[in-house]
Amino acid sequence: MQRCVIQRALTALAALCLSACGAAAPPADLYKAKAFVTGQDERNRRSGFAQSLPDVLVKVSGDPQLKDDPRVAALAATVETLAGSYVYHDRMEGLPIGDEQGTRDRPYDLTVSFKPDLIDAALKSLGREPWTAARPRIVVFLAVRNHARDYWLARDSEFGTDQRDAMASAAWTFGLPVQLPPGSAIANLPLTFDVPPKERLQNLADAAKAAGGDVALAGAMAWSDGFIGWHANWQLITKDKTYTWAIRDVSFDEAFRSAMRGTAQILSGHGQPE
């Protein structure tokens, strides 16, 4: 009986998601990265450029292992030659500036557009290639347990607005086309916080493809009494293999970064996430 319920729910999911999955294309912002800075002076801007460099190298290559590569830190010494344009977004937009000190300390998101040819050359010097082909479209099926409340994270659900924003931000950081199903399509799917059985994972993979996606990312994220942060498990279902990884005692922002970081690493051919 439960199998029939699951199959009906997955069929509904495919029908409802189909129009939301457009054709895969290279990410428009592939050579952009963001950093948090205070003020708009040149010193902080250089610091923001240096913060952004590892992120754009990871984003373009798909290899998160570059983040801690000491050779990337050495490249940061010439980061201003790699950066093209940049733009600030005031995190306190709409709030008045109180004084001159407030001007220096005002928080901004600095978005840096790097020069594609120079970033590609930098990657080749690090033994990597740019991952510029159309990237697989990912449909995310995520069960959330927040203390006493369990729910599917859906693109239109009452719960999880901040989590949806965090997932979108993480997907942008790693250059991945990601979408959530509508709540009506997954309402009848049984919630589970254990690693799903192989048959269930295959059903999700089939539903993702029927919905116009390329791969399914199944996850379970929980916060309960006694935890000091979120616990998250992820399974990326590809044609050849299902990859599993986990993260513990983190913010949900970091849990989503773990999901997107691992997905990018796998799909770009850089191995199994830890």
Identify the role of each PLM range.
Residues 20-26:
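Bacterial Sec-dependent signal peptides at the C-terminal "C-region" and cleavage site
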Residues 30-78, 82-94:
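N-terminal Sec/ER secretory leader and immediately downstream segment
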Residues 49-73, 136, 140-198:
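N-terminal segment of the mature soluble domain
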Residues 69-142:
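Signal peptide-directed extracytoplasmic domains
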Residues 81-95, 140-142, 180, 196-227:
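A short, hydrophobic beta-strand-centered structural micro-motif
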